[in-house]
Amino acid sequence: MTAANPASTPNPESAPRSRELFDRALAVTPGGVNSPVRAFHSVGGTPRFMVRGEGTYLWDADDNRYVDLVSSWGPMINGHAHPDVVRAVRQAAAGGLSFGTPGVGEIDLAAEIIDRVGPVEQVRLVNSGTEATMSAVRLARGFTGRRKVVKFAGCYHGHVDALLASAGSGVATLGLPTTPGVTGAQAADTIVLPYNDLDAVRRTFAEYGDEIACVITEAAAGNMGAIAPAPGFNGGLREITSSAGALLVMDEVMTGFRVSAAGWFGIDGVAGDLYTFGKVMSGGLPAAAFGGRADVMERLAPSGPVYQAGTLAGNPVAVAAGLANLRAATPEVYAALDRNAERLGELLGSALSAEGVPHQVAFAGNLVSVFFSEDPVRDYAGAQAQQSWRFPPFFHALLERGIYPPPSAFEAWFVNAAMDDAAFDAIAEALPHAAKAAAAATEPGAGA
């Protein structure tokens, strides 16, 4: 079945195979999934087990077709199964899956990243965004000789113990303030501040400035929903950290090479000392990177004393996928991403306004979010204050009509360049039903 010949429109009873697979998964995997947000915990119902993707569409195990607004949580800017990426993966895999030695592709991918992001002078490849942020923080501590790290509430930097306090993404979806298993000692040197609050940063540096190794921030927040940095926020972080001798770590795992060819740096031009990347640069395979100033990066082993390693880092197949994905992302692709995000936002706003549903359609570049709120959302407290109980019926009304949005009120929506008029027609047809469902939702406990 091709994108031009869709499967039947999903409905609540149309996913028996997914239900069967989920029951099997529950017996062998905690919660039935390998990443919590996939479990539909906050929206209820049966997670869809996807078996195929093409362009802007996904097909589940019951052969239902969906317009995909998750894009594998970001990597698929060119759409699923892009011919250039598939060709590169096949060619690389035919030559061998892993060697445990240096490879030519590692050099090419690192050079591509360096060419795109001006402040990045050297790159180290790793296997996941979590490894990238963990390694960047370790390197910042090793370079500065300091211990404390400043992060922002609602920003998610992978499941690094010291950075899970007041985190976004799956932690926010599950409503956890942090997570069991992270000890007080592991988080003792982590300072959590409100996002977009430079005054709080200044006060913290006034008290602890000579103890702070780095500030780590999402270049634009996407893990509590899409929240752009306030004008001057990233620039203010740059000034404060530079004055105090601390490093600025820009987490661009989500925004990198998605919101522009140079990531968020291509939008605001604020230079970090270190960067973390993933998602788009992986092409959908397990790969990530961190990089930055050469004098900082050269502190890594074997050049320097800060240890970091990975058996599968620089895997030739993953590197080939990432390089092909980046090279397929032409200026026309980035123009399409921006255009598609704007079009999606207009459809969301129009449908919700027609039903009188309190909402904010928010953008961080071409990341999109819907907050069920009367007021603009600029930080984690604002995201948490939304009427998130409206989201589950909104989500399921879309899912039942062949639209696959993120299954959480605290995640960004990801467009791709393969979206066409047919995809937007399907979204436009489904959204009025979803808006009505959101309008009819009642707050748990209301009237009790």
Swiss-Prot record:
GO terms for molecular function: glutamate-1-semialdehyde 2,1-aminomutase activity; pyridoxal phosphate binding; transaminase activity. Its EC number is 5.4.3.8. It is found in: Cytoplasm. Keywords: Cytoplasm, Isomerase, Porphyrin biosynthesis, Pyridoxal phosphate. Pathway: Porphyrin-containing compound metabolism; protoporphyrin-IX biosynthesis; 5-aminolevulinate from L-glutamyl-tRNA(Glu): step 2/2. The keyword Metal-binding does not apply. InterPro entries: 4pyrrol_synth_GluAld_NH2Trfase, Aminotrans_3, Aminotrans_3_PPA_site, PyrdxlP-dep_Trfase, PyrdxlP-dep_Trfase_major, PyrdxlP-dep_Trfase_small. One of its GO terms (cellular component) is cytoplasm. Its main location: cytoplasm. Its cofactor is pyridoxal 5'-phosphate. The modification N6-(pyridoxal phosphate)lysine is found at residue 279. The keyword Acetylation does not apply. It catalyses: (S)-4-amino-5-oxopentanoate = 5-aminolevulinate. One of its GO terms (biological process) is protoporphyrinogen IX biosynthetic process. Homodimer. Belongs to the class-III pyridoxal-phosphate-dependent aminotransferase family. HemL subfamily. This is Glutamate-1-semialdehyde 2,1-aminomutase. It comes from Saccharopolyspora erythraea (strain ATCC 11635 / DSM 40517 / JCM 4748 / NBRC 13426 / NCIMB 8594 / NRRL 2338).
